[in-house]
């Protein structure tokens, strides 16, 4: 029997270290970043998992608050009985009641392209998880990481740059871009050290 994140501070800390390292590396990168998953909400309070494919834009709220993402994951695990890997990857988002979006889509672009959407993947969840079912810390985080004009169930593609004032993107190079979307890039942090080791 696996111990839940909510009952295992050591496992929570390992997940936090891993996610912090990945988000910082992505935000600091000027080439391909690590492939990461992050979670957001929509206007209906439903959740979606976004997979960066090493290139997709991420709201600064996510890169600046890895602990907030971990709090969401702890609540999702508690509600859905889903065990997150130490790296935080989420296979088959519908299993946790979330929609799935991937920056690569059917064809990986090979580089960051401003305005390129994340594409919906997989099956929609049979029973979408709602922000209202999460604890107050997770709900507050997801109110900030929200696409307030979109419904994930109605969306086939989502452009992160259209919904957030400030983003991180893992590259300084792009072509065929929408130049108006290049201005909200947050300052790059210092790159992290070595990747944290999993103690699982």
Where are these regions (language model features)?
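Low-complexity intrinsically disordered segments
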Residues: 66-200
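Short N-terminal edge-element motif at the start of the domain
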Residues: 2-61, 66
């Amino acid at each position: 029997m696996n111990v839940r994140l909510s009952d295992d501070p050591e496992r929570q800390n390992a997940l936090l270290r891993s996610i912090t390292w990945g988000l910082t590396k992505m935000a600091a990168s000027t080439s391909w970043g690590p492939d990461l998953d992050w979670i957001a909400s929509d206007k209906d309070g439903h959740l979606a998992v976004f997979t960066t494919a090493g290139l997709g834009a991420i709201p600064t709220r996510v890169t600046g608050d890895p602990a907030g993402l971990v709090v969401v994951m702890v609540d999702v695990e508690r509600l859905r009985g889903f065990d997150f890997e130490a790296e935080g990857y989420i296979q088959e988002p519908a299993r946790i009641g979330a929609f799935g979006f991937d920056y690569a889509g059917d064809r990986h672009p090979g580089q960051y392209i401003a305005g390129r959407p994340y594409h919906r993947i997989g099956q929609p969840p049979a029973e979408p998880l709602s922000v209202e079912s999460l604890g107050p810390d997770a709900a507050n985080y997801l109110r900030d990481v929200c696409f307030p004009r979109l419904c994930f169930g109605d969306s086939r593609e989502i452009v992160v740059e259209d919904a957030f004032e400030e983003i991180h993107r893992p590259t300084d190079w792009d072509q065929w871009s929408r130049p108006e979307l290049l201005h909200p890039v947050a300052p790059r942090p210092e790159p992290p050290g070595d990747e944290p080791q999993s103690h699982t």
